[in-house]
Amino acid sequence: MRNFEDLQIAVAGTGYVGLSIATLLAQHHKVTAVDIIPEKVEKINNRISPIQDEYIEKYFAEKELNLTATLDGASAYKDADFVVIAAPTNYDPVKNFFDTHHIEDVIDLVLSVNPEATMVIKSTIPVGYCRSLYVKYAQNFAQMEPCLLYTSDAAD
């Protein structure tokens, strides 16, 4: 049986979903949050929430967190046991289309530096998307769970 203590977890994306997951997991595991926006990374590393959420702000101020942030996805994913993908998937109502390229960019990078990592997609995705990833990558993904958080209760 796998030991789930002292895991190294990378979280791709630091919006409401990604940052709340990273913050909660960082209470018990080493977590590296990855984002492409330098200001967000700097704020997280200085324990300032880049998003307005009272719970995340409270956790940053009061909890012992093993959380760092980086712009370098490859270094974060290289030694990760799990990679939580919380990348944006913008929906275009005119085309009736979810833009999932950010998810696939993360998957491609993870597979190139750490093909043994377990990837968990937490981004909002269209029905059947995980099946298409399985066909494309011949990979098993641990979980598909669309985001259903209220914006003011990200860490609740």
Which residue stretches match the model-derived regions?
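Rossmann-fold NAD(P)-binding glycine/threonine-rich loop
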Residues: 97-148
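A structural signal for isolated positions on well-ordered beta-strands in alpha/beta enzyme cores
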Residues: 10, 32, 68, 118-120
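Short glycine-/small-residue-rich Rossmann-like dinucleotide-binding loops
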Residues: 87-89, 124
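NAD(P)+-binding Rossmann beta1-loop-alpha1 motif at the extreme N-terminus of oxidoreductases
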Residues: 2-48
